[in-house]
């Protein structure tokens, strides 16, 4: 059965995992790291970089480097690169393509299905946008699950026989969630969730950036925030300082030649203490405490009922965050999970549940926000309360507001405010064909259906005429089927271009290597090679050099192969002359003349004497 991968699509970093031998395993990326920066960059030549390589060149290419795109999921935000507009779904899909390719390389097979995590407090538009991103990347998203819930799965997989109430505190790069869960007998039941989708490590970085920029401005009269390259250097320095202050009480921020004015170049060289960092970010830390209180209220538990507090997300490494949670809850924090990897591992476990590889696990999640419709007077009338276990279905009967009304508009909203206008509009649809009657007489049944992904379907039915209308919520910020199809095709085109570029690099590198080894070996052999043979090889080398910097890969391959075959023939002739009794066809392989393969020339004999020691050697003239 094909593998289903689990993906933590993060604001700043992403991670991919898979079930192997009944355990979730984090898949390293092509660069050897276990997490991949959620960064996409476009180069001047049209090349697209994703992950660590994209992040590394952000300073020199700030305008075409896209970071933290997850913060714009479910909005109409677009990124303009070289007069082409990209949606957050498309940029996220590029990160997903990278994770998918790394997983395929690791598993040695195609991957087409995934479970992807989202912040628990993501609304319907944001969840649908995440699912669309997966589709664009060539992945069938079998399930969208909440990040804290995924973390609890990874935490509790080996604790199936225990009964615990846990609080998951998830502070990532761009979002924050708190979930209260009850674990017991293989059932992971979410009791309540709360959070802030605009709070995360990026905001801690921004506080530092503003402090450094304001300090520099006070000293030099220059606002670095107006310089895109300088601000990118500040971002990198702020993130580095934040990380260092998690283990040290002081760090140095040194940015030479950050800018210049009429008096010459300007530099930043300042010390930053953990105490100052805590002062700058105190309000952000305090903002994380209210959702803890609200999630406890929603669950019906007291803090004394909570058995464990699980810290998830890279930003939970900040000492002030840990201290604040300890002080607020009065409990020690569980350190048994890797905050960067646990969410992806939980997604892989959910994938294992779907395939049947993981048995006796039942996940019961909740909808994070109240769902309702607008009724007379602009009031938001609730159909499904927040923290309701999903999947769920709820119906309620409404009527018309005017005499003779033959149609009604159903305005679907999500949020906690009492007036519809103050909540998030998920969609609108019209039920027409209602039989004319005095107001209050027609009976219109509105049904909300939330699936296991937290995605909403709404239907309305006139009980008198049987007329029915329904909508799968697709907010104006979400992509249409045609837009998704177009994005899928563009993603495939990018993938093909990336593959072609990779092949081009490999072919050209191979040509360079063959030329180098051929010229080196010719020099080493000296007058062992006749003038005629030497001229023949040099002619072939010239042909390779003439074509290797071009774009005609077939011409490069042909020229390289011609050179290789010519060299085979001549080297074989040399060794036959030196050793007439040697096996025919013996000779050097220029493909194997570098590094550890030097000296391992083929001798036309497959058998190897165990007592023979490979050694580097130098060919010298006979004396």
From Swiss-Prot:
Domain of life per record: Bacteria
Keywords: ATP-binding, Chaperone, Nucleotide-binding, Phosphoprotein, Stress response
Listed Low complexity bias regions: 591-604
A Pfam family: HSP70
GO molecular function: ATP binding; ATP-dependent protein folding chaperone; unfolded protein binding
Role this protein plays: Acts as a chaperone.
The protein's name: Chaperone protein DnaK
Native source species: Clostridium botulinum (strain 657 / Type Ba4)
């Amino acid at each position: 059965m094909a593998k289903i991968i689990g993906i933590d699509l993060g604001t700043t970093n992403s991670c991919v995992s898979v079930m192997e031998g009944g355990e979730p395993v984090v898949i390293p990326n092509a660069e050897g790291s276990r997490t991949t920066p959620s960064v996409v960059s476009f180069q001047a030549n049209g090349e697209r970089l994703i992950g660590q390589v994209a992040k590394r060149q952000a300073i020199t290419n700030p305008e075409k480097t896209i970071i933290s795109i997850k913060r714009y999921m479910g909005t109409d935000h677009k990124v303009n690169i070289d007069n082409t507009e990209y949606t957050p779904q498309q940029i996220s899909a590029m990160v997903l393509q990278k994770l998918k390719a790394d997983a395929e390389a690791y598993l040695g097979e195609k991957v087409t299905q995934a479970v992807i995590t989202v912040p628990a407090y993501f609304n319907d538009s944001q969840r649908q946008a995440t699912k669309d991103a997966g589709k664009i990347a060539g992945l069938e998203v079998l399930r969208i699950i909440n990040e804290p819930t995924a973390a609890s799965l990874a935490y509790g997989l080996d604790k199936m026989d225990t009964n615990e109430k846990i609080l998951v505190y998830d502070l990532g790069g761009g979002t924050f969630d708190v979930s209260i869960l009850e674990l017991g007998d293989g059932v992971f039941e979410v009791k309540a969730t709360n959070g802030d989708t605009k709070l995360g490590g990026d905001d801690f970085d921004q506080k530092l950036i503003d402090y450094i920029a304001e300090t520099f401005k006070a000293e030099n009269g220059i606002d670095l925030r107006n310089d895109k390259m300088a601000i990118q250097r500040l971002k990198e320095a702020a993130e580095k300082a934040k990380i260092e202050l998690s283990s040290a009480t002081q760090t140095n921020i040194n940015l030479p030649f950050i800018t210049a004015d009429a008096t010459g170049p300007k530099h930043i060289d300042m010390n930053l203490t953990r105490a100052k960092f805590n002062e700058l970010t105190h309000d952000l830390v305090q903002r994380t405490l209210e959702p803890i209180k609200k999630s406890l209220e929603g669950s019906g538990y007291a803090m004394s009922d909570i058995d464990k507090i699980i810290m998830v997300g890279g930003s939970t490494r900040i000492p002030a965050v840990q201290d604040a949670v300890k002080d607020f809850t009065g409990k020690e924090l569980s350190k048994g999970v890797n905050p960067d990897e646990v969410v992806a591992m939980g997604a892989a476990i959910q994938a294992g549940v779907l395939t049947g590889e993981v048995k006796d696990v039942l996940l019961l999640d909740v909808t994070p926000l109240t769902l309702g419709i607008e009724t007379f007077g602009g009031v938001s009338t609730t159909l499904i309360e927040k923290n309701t276990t999903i999947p769920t279905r709820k119906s309620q009967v409404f009527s018309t507001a005017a005499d003779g009304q033959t149609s009604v508009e159903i305005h679907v909203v999500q949020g906690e405010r009492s007036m519809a206008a103050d909540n998030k509009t998920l969609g609108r649809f019209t039920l027409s064909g209602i039989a004319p009657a005095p107001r209050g007489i027609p009976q219109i049944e509105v049904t909300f259906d939330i699936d296991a992904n937290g995605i909403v379907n709404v239907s309305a039915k006139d009980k008198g005429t049987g007329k029915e209308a329904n909508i799968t919520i697709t907010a104006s910020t979400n992509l249409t089927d045609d837009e998704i199809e177009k994005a899928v095709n563009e993603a495939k085109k990018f993938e093909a271009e990336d593959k072609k570029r990779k092949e081009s690099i490999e072919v050209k590198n191979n040509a360079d290597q063959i030329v180098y080894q051929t010229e080196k070996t010719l020099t080493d052999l000296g007058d062992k090679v006749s003038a005629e043979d030497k001229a023949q090889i040099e002619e072939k080398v010239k042909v390779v050099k003439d074509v290797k910097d071009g774009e005609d890969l077939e011409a490069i391959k042909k020229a390289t192969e011609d050179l290789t075959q010519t060299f085979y023939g001549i080297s074989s002739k040399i060794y036959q002359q030196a050793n007439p009794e040697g096996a025919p066809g013996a000779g050097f392989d220029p493909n194997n003349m570098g590094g550890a393969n030097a000296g391992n020339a083929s001798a036309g004999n497959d058998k190897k004497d165990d007592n023979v020691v490979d050694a580097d050697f130098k060919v010298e003239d006979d004396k």
